Swiss-Prot record:
Residues 100-143, 186-197, 255-268, 275-286 have a biased composition (Basic and acidic residues). Self-associates. Interacts with HD. Interacts with GTF3A. Interacts with MYO6. Interacts (via UBAN) with ubiquitinated TFRC. Interacts with GTP-bound Rab8 (RAB8A and/or RAB8B). Interacts with TBC1D17. Interacts with TBK1. Interacts with TRAF3. Binds to linear ubiquitin chains. Interacts with LC3 family members MAP1LC3A, MAP1LC3B, GABARAP, GABARAPL1 and GABARAPL2; OPTN phosphorylation increases the association (at least with MAP1LC3B). Interacts with RAB12; the interaction may be indirect. Gene3D superfamilies: L1 transposable element, trimerization domain (1.20.5.390), Nemo cc2-lz domain - 1d5 darpin complex (1.20.5.990). Plays an important role in the maintenance of the Golgi complex, in membrane trafficking, in exocytosis, through its interaction with myosin VI and Rab8. Links myosin VI to the Golgi complex and plays an important role in Golgi ribbon formation. Negatively regulates the induction of IFNB in response to RNA virus infection. Plays a neuroprotective role in the eye and optic nerve. Probably part of the TNF-alpha signaling pathway that can shift the equilibrium toward induction of cell death. It comes from Macaca mulatta. Residues 405-571 are annotated as: Interaction with HD. It comes from the Eukaryota. This is Optineurin. Phosphorylated by TBK1, leading to restrict bacterial proliferation in case of infection.
Amino acid sequence: MSHQPLSCLTEKGDSPSESTGNGPPHLAHPNLDTFTPEELLQQMKELLTENHQLKEAMKLNNQAMKGRFEELSAWTEKQKEERQFFETQSKEAKERLMALSHENEKLKEELGKLKGKSERSSEDPTDDSRLPRAEAEQEKDQLRTQVTRLQAEKADLLGIVSELQLKLNSSGSSEDSFVEIRMAEGEAEGSVKEIKHSPGPTRTVSIGTSRSAEGAKNYLEHEELTVSQLLLCLREGNQKVERLEIALKEAKERVSDFEKKASNRSEIETQTEGSTEKENEEEKGPETVGSEVEALNLQVTSLFKELQEAHTKLSEAELMKKRLQEKCQALERKNSATPSELNEKQELVYTNKKLELQVESMLSEIKMEQAKTEDEKSKLAMLQLTHNKLLQEHNHALKTIEELTRKESEKVDRAVLKELSEKLELAEKALASKQLQMDEMKQTIAKQEEDLETMTVLRAQMEVYCSDFHAERAAREKIHEEKEQLALQLAVLLKENDAFEDGGRQSLMEMQSRHGARTSDPDQQAYLVQRGTEDRDWQQQRNIPIHSCPKCGEVLPDIDTLQIHVMDCII
């Protein structure tokens, strides 16, 4: 057992029991005794600044993540709204195209009927004048109604086609066609003069990028121009329809006048009496009636031409309808054949969810930091309140001192001065006692720190002693095992020695018995007797017990009890 002094721990820097409390075991704590207070303050300030910088970096990162998340959410909402808008537009376009197809079929049938009637009227105009009055009036009424209906349907068709073109332009399809509709000033019914299709480049909708402000402004200006042009066209068409209605009214009035004149003529023909003046008027009457009928025929032919123009415009509208149907089919194909876009959207939704979770975690961390900052703010507010109170008390004390000085200067009552002096003495005594208590506390703290240091040293030394004890115990166990082995070997050797001695004695006895007469000298007998006594003493020494204490000589039965006794005896 090796007794090491307390100074051995300071000399041995690599004790096996030393280990750091925090951090990895290969990093040791810095020795605070080597640093000065100023260096410690500087390190604390540096740590505080680094902490502040890290907080600011976390805040900036949180703000950036929020901005990205808001941008992604806005982009996804825009994508959803645009998709819904495109779907609704495609449905409306399909419905309107179906309605337009039905209306076109009806108009074709009506135009065929009108063509047949106009051809009949152009082939035999003399027969039309001979028709009965009732049939002529019915045909005129039918023509008027058909003309008004055709005009209204033309205006509706033009408006629907323009709306469809505008909606297709605004839907952002793959073939972004720009349609310009201009109305001719000299036409009677506001027919479409030019429909220009300018094929634009295909758009590639890039993820994460929004439309620029200039493009939006140009698009809005173009929409406003097209709407204003359509409104002007509709106004002109309405005005022309009103003019045609007025012209039809005038023609109707003329027809009624001619009917009256014809009735008067029939009455004049039935009468037997007539004058030459009346005959001249009668001759002039049919001529005027024929001229007016020719004018009506011209109006009918002009209306037929207008109907032909409407037919051509309807054919153009059918072509536009086919193009629109093709575009709708292309849009449907795009909407149906976009699995990759759906996968991308799913990935975006997954990333959005991840970002939402990250933002929620960051928000929770921010809330924790805000709660900590609020606690610190409350503590600071409490400290400020206490500081303000202390300042107020200090100011009050200063004021009282000033008042006392004034009273002393003015030689106020000595009793008050005595009381104040006594109070001051008591306060000084209290301060001195408190200072003494503080000094005592500092001394006790220093002693406790020293005791703690000594305790740590003692603990380390105890661990060293324990390790030495265990090492010595293991060595003793090994020595005990070796002793047992040696004892066994001794026993074997002693047995062999006894056997050899017995054999020697027997051989001696035999020799003595053989040579008894020769060796009768007394000296030789005495030598043999002495040798026998020495052999007995050596056997007695050999029979000494092995388990005995080396210090006090106490004999013990076992090696374990011997070790315990040796530890107690030595310590």
